[in-house]
Amino acid sequence: MITIAEAVERDNAARRATLDEDYAHLERQLERRHVDIKALVARATAFRVAIPSWGVGTGGTRFARFPGPGEPRTLLEKIDDCGVVQSLVRVTPAMSLHIPWDKPRESGPGDVASIRARLLARGLAIESMNSNTFQDQPGQPLSYKFGSLTHTDFAVRRQAIEHNLECLAIGRDLGASSHTVWIGDGGNFPGQIHFRHAIDRYVESLQAIHAALPDGWRLFIEHKCYEPAFYSTVLNDWGIRYLCAREVGDRCLSLVDLGHHAPNVNIEQIVAQLIRLRALGGFHFNDSKFGDDDLDSGSIKPFQLFLVFNELVDAELEGIPGFAPAYMLDQSHNVTDPLESLMVSAMEVVRAYVQAHLVDRAALAEAQANNDAVRALQILKAAFRTDVSPILAAARVREGGAIDPVAAYRASGYRASVASQRPALASGGSGIV
């Protein structure tokens, strides 16, 4: 194995001349469109998307999970893996933690002090926390089988609330600034739950969590149209989510997971409405074909990802007060090296962001005012079809990253090295990580 830095240096040296040629060609193209390529490189350099701690391990399905070599066994090892991704792509300096999977130990390796030290050494920070009340944990007094924050039994709801408060405390110790709540509460059969009462209990539980938020924190909630409950999910669409957030409190905002919608829903229109309502908190980026597939971002529907960023960039350029969405990848890497998937996904998200900055906003506004549907689509497609790869690579190089992150990663031999140091994890039946 060679170090990541050595791999980047060697691989970049072999690719630099080609990058310079491609960059110069794109620069001339963009000049004809009166676009400053250096400004786009600066935007790509400044873009940030967080990595989920659970994303560096192998995912799975409800049928099976097939462990990969060198999977991280502890939070410290997850930090090491996230550090590798960041060293190569340079847009992922923050992590999101899931409790209790990432709960710090009381003392020794894995305690708060050692976690903070490892984060500092890897150039990372903790951005957000995530609670888990969709699984029962060993030794847990009460079960979430029939719900958590919306359970009919107050004692179960109180247990779920206390778990979220624990997440806030851990996050405060580690420097986080937001907390995300997703629940699997719902029903599999008609009549199983009382729809209105369940929402009432949900809002009441969230209000208790919202009241305990540390200063400067935001609370994100996300809906899901189905799964794990299949007849009804308590928080089943974006409208219900928005109304609940409004009831909960000013710092409760909507988080959009691209896979949590019904098939063919116009997600970019939902994003636009949340921006208008000043209710957009952030994103969990992934891709899907049929449901909440959690595939690599941009792998199936890259144009949809671009259209989402078209709305986000439009709001950014307009300077809408309070517009500061948090971006994170949320994926399940079942058949790939998770670090490679995270690198590719991060690059695809930045790609969509930069492409959205290529949209001729004045021309688009004119086409919309004139009801010129064909011209409007042409303007969007012109931006989407522009290959901005040289811009993304130049931004990475500027920050010390790799021209081709996956190639440099493979050349380093990192996966084989950690595989020899980390014993294989047993396959779990649930496929959940």
Show where each model-derived region lies.
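An active-site-proximal structural segment forming one wall of the substrate-binding cleft
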Residues: 115-119, 152-178, 198-213
